[in-house]
UniProtKB/Swiss-Prot annotation:
Mn(2+) 4 binds at residues 841, 843. The lineage of its organism: Bacteria, Bacillati, Actinomycetota, Actinomycetes, Micrococcales. Keywords: Amino-acid biosynthesis, Arginine biosynthesis, ATP-binding, Ligase, Magnesium, Manganese, Metal-binding, Nucleotide-binding, Pyrimidine biosynthesis, Repeat. This is Carbamoyl phosphate synthase large chain. Mg(2+) 4 binds at residues 841, 843. It comes from Clavibacter sepedonicus (Clavibacter michiganensis subsp. sepedonicus). It catalyses: hydrogencarbonate + L-glutamine + 2 ATP + H2O = carbamoyl phosphate + L-glutamate + 2 ADP + phosphate + 2 H(+). Mn(2+) 3 binds at residues 829, 841.
């Protein structure tokens, strides 16, 4: 069946901001879909609110809308663009829920738009817990005993029937949001309340406990002719009870017999048919009781999912690309396999290697959070590795996490076997290492299985790894057989060095002297049956290589590794654009990365892809292979965040050419003493500051500067470890915590700055070629200095800075670029306080705001910077038309305004008492993603950003106000405006008194900690929980008064109420209310570009 000729234009709905449970994998999926649809001659209209994505680049769609993903906005786009169809199955749960809402409101029928990729009935059957349960039972397959509840009362009643513990699973949510295991009625009531709140259909499934069962997934695809393929089987190493996104997973499934696999496959194919997915893919999860083999179906996703991206990267089978073709009418047997070019997509992939995915967590950002892993997903990223056996893939994946202690180690272990086993009973980040240590300390595999319920086969593999480590330790010398045995099981040179008590370079020298180097294999989808035509490689210590280096001029680009808070999709964006630009310039582009979620690890983003850990050893081996032919022009390290920058010195020491800013210049910017010299020479001012490597030094420096001080480690991203410290005792506590984490100490000094209160923070992204500075954009932060730039909302162009101040910022940036010796990208952060411009820090690399600037002003910063790194001048880039003559420092008055807003994951993290962690923002970054609002002025742009990030602001209702003493003067005008808009005002006694003096009538409510008066006197927390408050304004008052504020903020986050913790943020919101009332206009980036050209 050929492509449908009645579909000429398609509206693709993206997934919105990066959040836990829905991350960069949907940018990868959406980018593939947009590409293939355009290749098929379909006009693509895209809507997504996330500016950090590749898919929102104007080149991937004919009309690109960076707008909130709401029914109102989607209808306006449909009216304007008149698409024939809407494709929602590649944008995660966000897109699927949006499409269902369009159907329920009759918008699709009203405008004659078809839903493709999955019918509404199929989505309902797959997502509605009761419908799916009934369907599975009809098929003859087994499910856990369960009931669907729509009220708390129903849930309590059903729990009596099912018994404790039981599982709560909300409908139509992602990443297990609102789910969990309830062991008591108290836990049940809290979890059901959360689940009902999280579910758009206000329903939860209560299910018998299957804790400790083995968990599997199948990725399937089906077309309109009923051709069905199982793309990949995935097995969770962690048993049921840990969300699959938080579990170590392996593909293909390794502990199923062929009979068990075929049975699971048959069930999966029957379910996809019954659900009715006939133009795309789906993911089905199963559980198997290890005691008797009972197999049950857990749930399904009737769309491309997080696991689909992993399955695509694991197999080389592009699920999203094929799903897009199926959606416009093709059959599987009509779609060629990109990798072999001779087999169709109806051939199921075959693997002759093992793939392991390991999650990356960010509990260090939320120290109060309970670190136990449950059915609610908490990981913020993941790394993937490919090996010829499980032990190799596992060890490579663990070292890809780039976290201290994440790999297996063989140093001193002070804990006893009993302590290690007890620790391993609770699933946490790093449990696999605890298991390794327990086995090493003498625990038996049976004891480990009893504690963890991890399948014995996986435990035996760790026993094997420990045995190899013992052989390395006990060998008389580090000879070739010993080294080869270690390498065959994934040991790094650093691990071997630790076991032997020698240096890593000594191991590397011995290995090279013995002629032991990796070869590189190819991912081909067919286990070598057909030749692979796409260069997608992984390392192995087998004897035969499958690659031949080209004789071209080539550039290696180091990716940013697994996503984490502070280093996310924004850096992948820069890497991808560098690859595109350098390829267009005639270079062979070689990407090294280990993140399965990203566009950079798609097999057709670069000329050659190495799916490898970003460690010095692994990168050097790739460099060695590529230098065997052609010319390696250099390695790009300034686009992959701190991961890539951290390798610069080691690569340079090994004689590898570094493109762009040199490692010594990077040190000039990072090392406080050297950077101060540059500022002094340029006549620039920094806040009073100093450095320390010992606690006594730190105390002296802090007392000289004067409290409060801002403290942070060197060489970190995302403000990791950054805090505002008010006294010596807190400084002592801070220093010990950071030293324990190994991020400060000798060679890693602590940076101490005077904290600037009431200052405006400014960001600038620019390119410098050694002669000319080109400004990408100057951004003004909405929140005052003290909140990490990644968590602060910002506006481009600035809305309160004068031309003179902007020019001062540009001049200072030029002086810094020249002094440091930048070649390529530079990000500088400034603050203006009391009329003085302070330099906070300079980063000679890509920043997380590069995509935002590029989308807001239409300037391809990453592409231009990559060409500057290989010697192209800014003048040449202007002459070629890649860079506009007018840079981002000179934005016309009538230009649109763009606002970036951070999206925060507080609802995912709870304390051991079940409370949501405190949502107060500070100098350490906590956001997982971002959105952009763009419109003709700041109020409209800000309103859009709030709608996209938080679901918008209510136009009426009740507002609660409780602010710190320092904010009581500045709170009056915003609250007065809210009252004029019709809001009823509630306040605590102290705040109400101030408001009353200024003519604002506020009803006094008691604090959470105050004793109730006679009669019914609900606290503010009670009112929030009863849904009697619509907006919460609460600014923190310092540590001693935090208890009340914390309870208020936690209740607001749990109830999904708009929460303002800074006056600046509130003031911006109040200014946007008129814009919200007027409704949003929608404009594509392409239309903005046309208007921009007309102004030039």
């Amino acid at each position: 069946m050929p492509k449908r000729d009645d579909i000429n234009s398609v509206l693709v709905i993206g997934s919105g901001p990066i959040v836990i449970g829905q991350a960069a994998e949907f940018d990868y999926s959406g980018t593939q879909a947009c590409r293939v649809l355009r290749e098929e001659g379909v006009r693509v209209i895209l809507v997504n609110s996330n500016p950090a994505t590749i898919m929102t680049d104007p080149g991937f769609a004919d009309a690109t809308y960076i707008e909130p993903i709401t029914s109102e906005v989607l209808e306006k786009i449909i009216i304007k663009e008149r698409p024939d169809a809407v494709l929602p199955t590649l944008g995660g749960q966000t897109a699927l829920n949006a499409a269902i809402r369009l159907d329920e409101l009759g918008i699709l029928a009203k405008h004659g738009v078809e839903l493709i990729g999955a019918k509404v009935e199929a989505i309902q059957k797959g997502e509605d817990r009761q419908l799916f349960k009934d369907l599975v039972i009809e098929s003859g397959a087994d499910v856990a005993r369960s009931h669907v509840a729509k009220t708390l009362e129903q849930a309590v009643e059903f729990a009596e029937d099912l018994g404790y513990p039981l599982v709560i699973r909300p409908s139509f949510t992602m990443g297990g949001l609102g789910s969990g295991f309830a062991h008591t009625r108290q836990e049940l009531e809290r979890m059901v309340a959360d689940g009902l709140q999280s579910s758009p259909t206000t329903e939860v499934l209560l299910e018998e406990s299957i804790l400790g069962w083995k968990e599997y997934e199948l990725e399937l695809m089906r077309d309109t002719a009923d051709n069905t393929v199982v793309v990949c089987s995935i097995e969770n190493v962690d048993p049921v009870g840990v969300h699959t996104g938080d579990s170590i997973t392996v593909a293909p499934a390794l502990t199923l017999t062929d009979r068990e696999y075929q049975h699971m496959r048959d069930i999966g194919i029957d379910i996809i048919r019954r659900v009715g997915v006939d133009t795309g893919g789906c993911n089905i999860q199963f559980a198997v009781d290890p005691t008797n083999g009972r197999l049950i179906v857990i749930e399904m996703n009737p769309r491309v999912s997080r696991s689909s991206a992993l399955a695509s990267k694991a197999t080389g089978f592009p699920i999203a690309k094929i799903a897009a073709k199926l959606a416009i009418g093709y059959r599987l047997d009509e779609i060629p396999n990109d990798i072999t070019k001779v087999t169709p997509a109806s051939f199921e992939p075959t693997l002759d290697y093992v793939v392991v995915k390991v999650p990356r967590f960010a509990f260090e950002k939320f120290p109060a959070a309970d670190a136990e892993l449950t059915t609610t997903m908490k990981s913020v990223g993941e790394a993937m590795a490919i090996g010829r056996n499980y032990s190799t893939a596992l060890q490579k994946a663990l070292r890809s996490l780039e976290k201290r202690g994440s790999s297996f180690h063989w140093g001193a272990e002070s804990r006893s076997v009993e302590e290690l086993l007890e620790t391993s009973r609770i699933p946490t980040d790093g449990r696999i290492v605890t298991v390794q240590q327990a086995l090493r300390a003498g625990a038996t595999p049976e004891q480990v299985f009893d504690a963890t319920k991890i399948d014995p086969w996986f435990i035996d593999q760790i026993v094997l790894i420990n045995e190899v480590a013992d052989a390395v330790r006990d060998a008389d010398e580090l000879d070739a057989p010993t080294l080869r045995e270690a390498k065959d099981h994934g040991f790094s040179d650093a691990q071997i060095a630790e076991i032997r008590g020698i240096g890593e370079q000594e191991v590397r020298d011995a290995r090279h002297a013995a002629g032991i180097r990796p070869v590189f294999k190819t991912v081909d989808t067919c286990a070598g049956e057909f030749p692979a035509l796409t260069p997608y490689h992984y390392s192995s210590y087998d004897s035969e290589t499958e690659i031949v280096p080209s004789d071209r001029r080539k550039v290696i680009i180091l990716g940013s590794g697994p996503n984490r808070i502070g280093q996310g999709i924004e850096f992948d964006y820069s890497c991808v654009h560098a690859s595109f630009a350098l390829a267009d310039a005639g270079f062979e582009t070689i990407m090294i990365n280990c993140n399965p979620e990203t566009v950079s690890t798609d097999y057709d983003t670069s000329d050659r892809l190495y799916f490898e850990p970003l460690t010095l050893e692994d990168v050097l081996e790739i460099v060695h292979v590529e230098q065997q032919a052609g010319e390696l022009v250099g390695v790009v390290v300034q686009l992959g965040g701190q991961t890539a920058l951290g390798l610069a010195k080691g690569l340079e020491a090994a004689g590898v050419p570094i493109l762009g800013t040199s490692p010594s210049a990077i040190d000039l910017a990072e090392e406080r003493g050297l950077f101060s010299g540059i500022l002094d020479a340029a006549g620039l001012v920094a806040p009073r500051n100093g450095t320390a490597v010992a606690i006594d030094e730190a105390v002296v420096v802090a007392e000289e500067i004067g409290y409060p001080v801002l403290v942070r480690p060197s060489y970190v991203l995302g403000g990791r470890g950054m805090e505002i410290v008010f006294d010596t005792a807190t400084l002592h506590d801070y220093f010990l915590r950071m030293a324990d984490q190994g991020i400060i100490g000798e060679g890693k000094p602590l940076l101490i700055d005077r904290f600037l209160d009431d200052a405006i923070e400014i960001d600038i992204d620019a390119i410098y070629d050694g002669t000319e500075l080109y400004v990408g954009g100057v951004m003004e932060h909405i929140e005052e200095a003290g909140i990490h730039s990644g968590d602060s909302s910002c506006t481009l162009p600035p809305v309160t800075l004068g031309r003179g101040q902007i020019q001062q910022v540009v001049d200072a940036t030029r002086a810094i670029a020249e002094g440091v010796g930048v070649r390529g990208l530079l990000n500088v952060q400034f603050a203006i306080g009391a009329g003085v411009l302070y330099v906070l820090e300079a980063n000679p690399r890509a920043s997380r705001t590069v995509p935002f600037v590029s989308k807001a002003l239409g300037i391809p910063l990453a592409k231009a910077a990559s060409l500057v790194m290989v010697g192209t001048s800014i003048a040449e880039l202007k002459a070629s038309g890649l860079l506009p003559e007018r840079d981002g420092s000179d934005v016309p008055m009538d230009s649109p305004v763009a606002v970036k807003e951070a999206v925060l994951p507080f609802k995912r993290f709870r304390t051991k008492d079940g409370l949501i962690v405190d949502s107060v923002l500070g100098p350490e970054m906590r956001s997982t993603g971002e959105v952009m609002g763009i419109d003709r002025d700041f109020p409209r742009a800000f309103a859009k950003s709030q709608e996209a990030a938080f679901g918008g602001l209510p136009l009426s209702g009740t507002v609660f106000v409780s602010v710190a003493d320092r904010d009581k003067r500045s709170i009056v005008l915003p609250v007065l405006r809210l009252q004029q808009l019709g809001f009823e005002v509630l306040a605590t006694a102290g705040t109400a008194e101030i408001l009353s003096r200024n003519g604002i009538q506020a009803r006094v409510v008691r604090k959470y900690s105050e004793e109730p008066a006679a009669g019914d006197s609900p606290s503010i927390v009670d009112l929030i929980n009863r849904d009697e408050v619509d907006v919460v304004i609460n600014t923190p008052s310092g540590r001693t008064a935090r208890a009340d504020g914390y309870e208020i903020r936690a209740a607001a986050v749990a109830a999904d109420k708009p929460l303002f913790t800074t006056i600046a943020q509130l003031t911006a919101a109040v200014a946007s209310f008129d814009a919200i009332r007027a409704g949003f206009d929608v404009t594509s980036l392409q239309d903005y570009a046309i208007a921009r050209e007309a102004r030039r």
